[in-house]
Amino acid sequence: MEVRVIEGEFKGEGVKIGVVVARFNDLLTNELLSGALDCFERHSVEEVDVVKVPGSFEIPLVAKKLAESGKYDAVLALGAVVRGETKHFDLVANEVAKGVAKVSLDSGVPVIFGVITVEDELQGFNRAGVKSNKGFEYAMAALEMANLMKKLREKE
């Protein structure tokens, strides 16, 4: 029996990334974006386009537009949803997650869900801060998936 393992790599050469970032909760989303851009720079990504949207709920529509453009190897969706005293948190978080997954499946382009859902801003800063920046981690996933999809296309 022959077993082949196909994995993506963390190489940025020849990779083009589209980033959709929400402005709402920008103290957190700016940190996520900073972490992602740091990752892309360290891995020599050639082209990154950043598109800002009002809030996390608007991310799926713009992610769809970027994915369908044919210009990007992966799309990274960054946002922050902070729990309040209403059910709005759950509605937004669930719909954004579903929307991002649908865009990825429908377009065939990896769309990475980089929307943090937190109880309060302190928890958000712990996830988007200097000690641990989820933006960097989500960017790594975008790189890995972009390269994996390229490899899978070569196998067809």
Curated annotation (Swiss-Prot):
Q: Which GO terms describe its biological process?
A: riboflavin biosynthetic process
List the active-site residues. 88
Tell me the residue numbers annotated for binding 5-amino-6-(D-ribitylamino)uracil. Answer: 24, 56-58, 80-82, 113
Q: Which keywords belong to this entry?
A: Riboflavin biosynthesis, Transferase
What's a Pfam family in this record? Answer: DMRL_synthase
Q: Name the pathway.
A: Cofactor biosynthesis; riboflavin biosynthesis; riboflavin from 2-hydroxy-3-oxobutyl phosphate and 5-amino-6-(D-ribitylamino)uracil: step 1/2
Q: What EC designation does it have?
A: 2.5.1.78
Q: Which Gene3D superfamilies match?
A: Lumazine/riboflavin synthase
| Family from the record | Belongs to the DMRL synthase family.
What the entry lists under HAMAP family is as follows:
Lumazine_synth
Q: What is this protein called?
A: 6,7-dimethyl-8-ribityllumazine synthase
What organism does the UniProt record list as the source? Thermococcus kodakarensis (strain ATCC BAA-918 / JCM 12380 / KOD1) (Pyrococcus kodakaraensis (strain KOD1))
Its lineage opens with: Archaea, Methanobacteriati, Methanobacteriota, Thermococci, Thermococcales
